[in-house]
Amino acid sequence: DKLWTRTNIRKNLGYEGPVIFSEHHESHAASAFFPSPFQEAAILTMDGVGEWATSSLALGKENKIELLQELHFPHSLGLLYSAFTYYLGFKVNSGEYKVMGLAPYGKPIYSKLIRENLIDLKEDGSFRMNMEYFDFLGGMTMTNHKFEAVFNHPTRNSETKLTQKEMDIASSLQ
């Protein structure tokens, strides 16, 4: 269907002019900056993944947005959060709010483990995920046995009762 988007737009709308697409993070930046009351602003966008960008830093000034930096797939806070969503037994792309909701009931006792093993936070605010712990590149799951070993606990089955451990992991991620 995506291959025929331009054709379908022209056919369904009776439109003959050019059809232009913007990049995913560019759209996020524009929808945040242009309706804002600011003439100049720093713009930070972060989500799972757009085309290849997962995070972007831009400068909005008057009627222009200048891209300053991008992080690219697979290094993504959105995908990191989805990996934890999966590991904690919730459905990816719909259960992330449950992880956020669990966080206040836990203690961030695993934060150091997460930083030491799963994500490398850089001085400039960027980050790199340690892909040895994740399976979303080619596997059928978000995480793998090495991820489970970090927490000394298997991936939670969605039918099992939540424990303090899951709450502490959610708090540590948050």
What do these predicted regions represent?
Residues D1-Q174:
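Short acidic/glycine-rich loops and adjacent helix/strand connectors
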